C-alpha cells in the first residue's frame, strides 16, 4: 500500500510504497533511514491517534492505502542532544570560518598583487593585516553588513527615496527610463561583486611577456607580442647593437595600428640568441622609433615555430630552445607601467604598410596591389616624393595596363626566379618594380 509521511518539524513530505504486513517496528526503522530520526524520538500519528505496538502490522493498526502518517519528535532527551549537536556544529563552523579568515589574511600578506589591490579597494581592512584578531573582526563585520543587505548593489536611503518618487509616477517615460537605469546599475554592481569574489585577479594588472635576447652579441630585453604583425627594433637600440648600418632605407613607410608611426627602414637579417642559449637564429626587424626598444612579433614567432607556454611561463623556440618569461621586477624599463607615456602604434599594431603602389607588411596577396603607400626609393628626388599617390582603383588600373611594358624592364630570368618561389608573374614584376630590380629585396617583399 501507499502511505504519505509528513514530518512536522520541517514540513518534509515523503510518499512510500510498503507492505501491509510490515510491523510498526520495521516501519519506524524505515522512517529512521529516511528522516534520520531514531525510533525512540519518533511520534507517529494516524487520524490524530498515536501508533503503538511494535509487533503489530500496519494493517492491524488500521492503516489503509493513501493514508497520511504524521511524524513528530517527543523526546526531551533528543531535543537536548540535538541542541548539543547544534552547539557542536556551530563551534565547528566557527573554527572553520576562523581558519578561512586566517588563510585569507596569509594570502594577502604573501601575494603582492592581492595586497596592493586590498590597499586600494579597502584601506581600513588593509591596515589590520598584521593583526590577526583585528583582521578577523573587520571581516566578520563586513560579512554581517553583507548579510543585512548593505551590499554594493543595494540602495542607500537617498536612492531608495528617489526610487519611491519615481514609482509614484510609473507612467512617465522619464521615470521609467530612470528606474531601468537604476536597476541596470544594480545588476552591474552585483556582477562586479561576484567578480570580486570568484576572480579577484581580474582587477589587477597582468605582467607583459618579456624575454632576454642577444642581438649581435648585445643582451637586450624583448617584449613578446603575438598580436604585432612584425618584429620591431628602435633606431636607438639598433645603433647600440651595432646594426644600424644594415638599415635599408628603401623600406620607409608607415606603421598603422591604433595610431600610426613612421617606418625608418628594415634590417633584413641579424643573428639573435634566445635566453641563455648559444644557438643563433636569423631575425629581421622593422625599424620604428617607438617606446618599445625591441618587440618580438608574430612574423618571427611563426617563422621559428615558437610556443607561448603560459602554464610553465616559458617561450619555446623551435621545440628545443626554452627561456623563462621575465618577472616584473626583472624588467629594466617597462613602458606598460601606469604613468609611462608611449606610442600606441607599435605594440599590438597590425604592422606597417609600404608606400607608392606598394604592399602591406606581412602579406603577399594580390589585394596588396591596391594599398596606398609611401616607399621612397633611394634615387628619388624630393619633388617626386611630395607628389600625391593616386587612389587605389587608379593604381590597380595603371598597373594592369603597364604590366606588359614593365616586364620588359627586367630580365626574364629574374622574373622566373621569383615565379619559381610560388608567386604569380604579376606579383613578381610588381615586387621587382618596388625593389628597383633587386631580386633579393623583391623576394623579401613577397615573403613578408
Swiss-Prot record:
Residues 146-175, 378-411 are annotated as: Disordered. The lineage of its organism: Eukaryota, Fungi, Dikarya, Ascomycota, Saccharomycotina. This is DNA damage-inducible protein 1. Belongs to the DDI1 family. Pfam families: Asp_protease (PF09668), UBA (PF00627), ubiquitin (PF00240). GO terms for molecular function: aspartic-type endopeptidase activity; polyubiquitin modification-dependent protein binding; proteasome regulatory particle binding; protein-macromolecule adaptor activity; SNARE binding; ubiquitin binding. Its main location: cytoplasm. The active site is at residue 225. Residues 146-167, 378-388 have a biased composition (Polar residues). The gene is DDI1. One of its GO terms (biological process) is protein transport to vacuole involved in ubiquitin-dependent protein catabolic process via the multivesicular body sorting pathway. Keywords: Aspartyl protease, Cytoplasm, Hydrolase, Protease, Protein transport, Transport. Probable aspartic protease. May be involved in the regulation of exocytosis. Acts as a linker between the 19S proteasome and polyubiquitinated proteins via UBA domain interactions with ubiquitin for their subsequent degradation. Required for S-phase checkpoint control. Residues 1-78 form the Ubiquitin-like domain. Binds ubiquitin and polyubiquitinated proteins.
